[in-house]
From Swiss-Prot:
List of residues binding Mg(2+): 15
Lineage of producing organism: Bacteria, Pseudomonadati, Bacteroidota, Bacteroidia, Bacteroidales
Catalytic activity of the protein: shikimate + ATP = 3-phosphoshikimate + ADP + H(+)
Enzyme Commission number(s): 2.7.1.71
GO CC annotation terms, alphabetical: cytosol
Protein name: Shikimate kinase
Similarity section: Belongs to the shikimate kinase family.
Record keywords: Amino-acid biosynthesis, Aromatic amino acid biosynthesis, ATP-binding, Cytoplasm, Kinase, Magnesium, Metal-binding, Nucleotide-binding, Transferase
Organism: Phocaeicola vulgatus (strain ATCC 8482 / DSM 1447 / JCM 5826 / CCUG 4940 / NBRC 14291 / NCTC 11154)
Pathway: Metabolic intermediate biosynthesis; chorismate biosynthesis; chorismate from D-erythrose 4-phosphate and phosphoenolpyruvate: step 5/7
Length: 175
């Protein structure tokens, strides 16, 4: 039975690497945000607005506990998931946790391209975006660093890099 939780900041590649890794290993893939959206028929943004951060984080925690019961699965968590309640410890108890560590400049490049799709980032200038990323990483690093495995995920820009990362992650996890 395999349970792998991918954690890291938005734009770290949790979904990109998670899907590719799950496919390679014949595992199921779950994006926790998508799982929540499917269950409640609302976007994460809508749930956040309706319930506030505390209400959303409690809901997220319940959904994390639900998906942690699944077997043979790779779970891509929300960027903030490890930072609330006992979520990080819970994931460590339930399976392997992998922190996808990405340099701030790489996150900036990835998020700058997709910032209109991310409400938190949509109206930020380049300077504000970089500051936002650095501040968030500083706050979240103590939680992310509790992962059982650290994996550098700076190179996920094309199929070759993604496959190389999948191969490296397999070796790291002895799979």
């Amino acid at each position: 039975m395999t349970r792998i939780f991918l954690i890291g900041y938005m734009g770290a590649g949790k979904t990109t690497l998670g899907k590719a890794f799950a496919r390679e290993m014949s595992l199921n893939f779950i994006d926790l945000d998508w799982f929540i959206e499917e269950r409640f028929h609302k976007t994460v943004q809508q749930l956040f607005l309706e319930r506030g951060e505390d209400g959303f984080r409690e809901l997220e925690r319940k959904m994390l506990h639900e998906v942690a019961e699944f077997e043979d699965v790779v779970v891509s968590t929300g960027g903030g998931t490890p930072c609330f309640f006992d979520n990080m410890e819970y994931m460590n108890d339930c399976g392997d946790t992998v922190f996808l560590d990405v340099e701030p400049a790489v996150l900036f490049r990835r998020l700058r391209v997709a910032k209109q799709q991310r409400p938190l980032l949509a109206n930020k200038s380049d300077e504000e975006l970089m500051d936002f990323i650095c501040e968030a990483l500083q706050k979240r690093h103590p939680f992310y660093s509790k992962a059982k495995h650290l994996f550098k995920a700076d190179e996920l820009e094309d199929k070759r890099q993604i496959q190389a990362s999948v191969d490296s992650l397999r070796k790291k996890l002895n799979k």
